[in-house]
């Protein structure tokens, strides 16, 4: 069983291909998307995605716009921003918008795997709390 199901969003095909190989070797299930729009479609089609690894600099819908859209439509999905063009301002903006973390390219694969694992665990904890709250409501109504 995979450690985490990831959606990797980057417009650079060679980078995506390399990362899929590296993450798959570490027992991650990875789906590729090459634009912000495609990432939203893939998230809608693949309900089990736990973590999105999202490039900041992309043509069309950039990473910050994509992050906003993901958090609006899929609030429990954790997003790790990954970029080679980071500024302090963009990192702060990403974190304010709900990014789990903000890493530089090229990222150490072990660090990235650690962050993905932490993000997936956070998503699972949030889902468990929601289920617990729903069960509490059902139990309370039944009394």
Task: Show which residues each predicted segment covers.
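C-terminal output helix
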Residues: 107-117
């Amino acid at each position: 069983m995979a450690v985490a199901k990831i959606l990797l969003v980057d417009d650079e095909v060679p980078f995506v291909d390399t990362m899929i190989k590296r993450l798959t070797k570490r027992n991650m299930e990875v789906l590729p998307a090459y634009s912000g729009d495609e990432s939203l479609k893939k998230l809608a089609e693949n309900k089990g995605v736990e973590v999105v690894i999202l490039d900041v600099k992309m043509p069309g819908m950039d990473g910050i716009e994509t992050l906003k859209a993901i958090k609006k439509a899929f609030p429990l999905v954790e997003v790790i921003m990954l970029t080679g063009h980071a500024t302090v301002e963009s990192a702060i903006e990403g974190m304010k918008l709900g990014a789990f973390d903000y890493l530089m390219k090229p990222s150490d694969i072990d660090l990235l795997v650690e962050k993905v694992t932490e993000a997936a665990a956070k998503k699972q904890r949030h889902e468990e709390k929601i289920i617990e709250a729903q069960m509490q409501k059902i139990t309370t109504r039944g009394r």
